[in-house]
Design a protein with these regions (language model features):
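Glycine-rich loop at the start of a catalytic domain that most often binds anionic cofactors/ligands
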Residues: 2-7, 42-50
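Active-site loop segments of alpha/beta catalytic cores
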Residues: 2-14, 18-19, 30-33, 54, ...
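Glycine-rich, N-terminal phosphate-binding loop and its surrounding beta-alpha-beta segment
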Residues: 16-46
């Protein structure tokens, strides 16, 4: 076990990343996925991730909140992690990631989803100001991050779950008005640094995909769940304009046998071929309840189908 090494001194962090990068290399990846989340550095946060009492419930809370401290807290906490990774990155590999958490998630860390919905009705001005302020703060973090660590990365990304099984969590109009402008500022910085931007967003977000592609300028999108739309549907609809990351529903990784998984994956690849570039993997992050053998079956199947000898 090496997980605790990341909490050690700089040399221990480097040893952690040697093991961490070796895993991706041995699994056949060209990239290492690594991010550190902004929400972890927001004072009083946790209303989304840990269901704590929201730190912002009204205008007075908003005005008293230490917004200006967040960028400093972020880099004080995480700069050594990124530097350690930078020093041990294997030759020929790059990283995908950056400052984790998108605008919607960071707002919810302070208000909770229910609290945010109440503010939408009770104080529309505060509701708008929350997105504006989080957008400004996160953009400051991204600017500093790209100045320091852009060379470590081949693709920049954050995750911001805008939807659920059948719709977006906010109206499409609210996403366009309050979230899309903040995305634009960050993605512009990413593009100015010469990097492509990948958005991870769960849910049925079809109503805002045109905005994400045409207005924000995302270069790729990740997340798929068969109950919403099988991966080939995303590739067929958007593959001529953006890259698509994903492929196999994470639930299928849990339950399919290796022969069943091979049939599933071969079918997905066949349907996606000819519709632009895609990167095959799980439709969402691999949680701890996924059987290790299921994950290994996925990796081995894809590597075999692309012609590797395992």
């Amino acid at each position: 076990p090496f997980a605790s090494l990341i909490d050690g001194d700089f040399e221990e962090k480097k040893e952690y990343f040697r093991h961490y990068c070796a895993f991706f290399y041995k699994m056949g990846y060209d990239t290492v996925s690594f991010e550190q989340c902004i929400g972890a550095c927001m004072p009083g946060a946790g209303a989304l991730g840990n269901h704590v009492d929201p730190v912002i419930k009204n205008r007075a809370d908003f005005e008293a909140y230490p917004w200006e401290e967040i960028p400093t807290l972020y880099f004080e906490r995480f700069s050594e992690d990124f530097r350690a990774l930078q020093e041990v990155m294997p030759a020929g590999m790059k990283t995908i990631g950056g400052p984790g958490n998108g605008i919607f998630e960071c707002v919810q860390e302070l208000t909770g989803y229910t609290g945010l919905c109440y503010l939408m009705a009770d104080d529309p001005a505060l509701y708008a100001d929350l997105f504006r302020k989080v957008g400004q703060t996160n953009q400051m973090i991204w600017k500093q991050f790209l100045d320091r660590f852009a060379d470590l990365y081949c693709v920049m990304r954050f995750g911001d779950d805008l939807g659920y099984k059948s719709n977006t969590l906010l109206s499409a109009q609210d996403i366009r008005q309050h979230i899309i402008p903040a995305y634009c500022g960050i993605v512009q910085l990413v593009h100015e640094a010469g990097k492509p931007f990948l958005l991870h967003s769960c849910g049925a977000i079809f109503d805002v995909m045109e905005d994400l592609i045409d207005t924000v300028g995302i270069d790729a999108k990740h997340s798929n769940e068969d109950q919403i739309a099988p991966f080939p549907q995303w590739v067929e609809r958007y593959g001529d304009r953006i890259g698509n990351f994903g492929g196999i529903d994470t639930d299928a990784v849990c339950h399919l046998t290796k022969p069943e998984m091979r049939e599933y994956i071969a079918d997905v690849i066949a349907k996606c071929s000819g519709h632009g570039g895609f990167a095959f993997g799980s439709g969402n992050s691999i949680p701890d309840y996924v059987p290790a053998q299921g994950y290994l079956n996925m990796i081995e199947t894809v590597r075999e189908l692309r012609g590797e000898k395992i």
